[in-house]
């Protein structure tokens, strides 16, 4: 499996510009022969999004933009792994999760929230994100794969 790592320079909160960069680099990666293109943690939203994750409107816009990326990527053969902010399960103590989604064949085929949230030095993720309770494998081009 040929994997491309797309280290993009995104902007916190600028969902549309970040989505455009993701799609541009996805096309470039596929042209270079990649079967999977992996983007950074929180590539869609920018890192660190801090208090933006406390606004339901931001979470809703993020979900809509992630779906728009999936729709635009429908013509690609390569699968994309995109970091984004997801809504936590109902009744969670914190409303957002730091997550990764697999986009394949124009749809979001898998999503996983981060389990181990750093909370030291410059990291304050436990303040803003709900950790995942478990981790599942995804399938990339017929192969079971872990995304951490």
Region roles according to the model:
Residues 1-148:
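Enzyme catalytic cores with a strong preference for nitrogen-chemistry domains
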């Amino acid at each position: 499996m040929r994997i491309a790592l797309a280290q993009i320079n995104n902007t916190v909160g600028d969902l549309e510009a970040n989505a455009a960069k993701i799609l541009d680099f996805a096309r470039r990666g596929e042209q270079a022969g990649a079967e999977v293109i992996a983007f950074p943690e929180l590539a869609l939203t920018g890192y660190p999004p801090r208090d933006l994750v406390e606004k339901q409107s931001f979470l809703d816009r993020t979900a809509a933009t992630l779906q728009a990326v999936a729709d635009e990527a429908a013509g690609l053969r390569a699968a994309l792994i995109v970091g984004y902010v997801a809504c936590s399960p109902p009744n969670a103590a914190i409303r957002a999760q730091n997550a990764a989604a697999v986009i394949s064949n124009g749809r979001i085929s898998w999503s996983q929230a981060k389990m181990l949230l750093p909370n030291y030095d410059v990291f304050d993720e436990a303040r803003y994100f709900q950790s995942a309770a478990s981790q599942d494998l995804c399938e990339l081009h017929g192969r079971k794969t872990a995304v951490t």
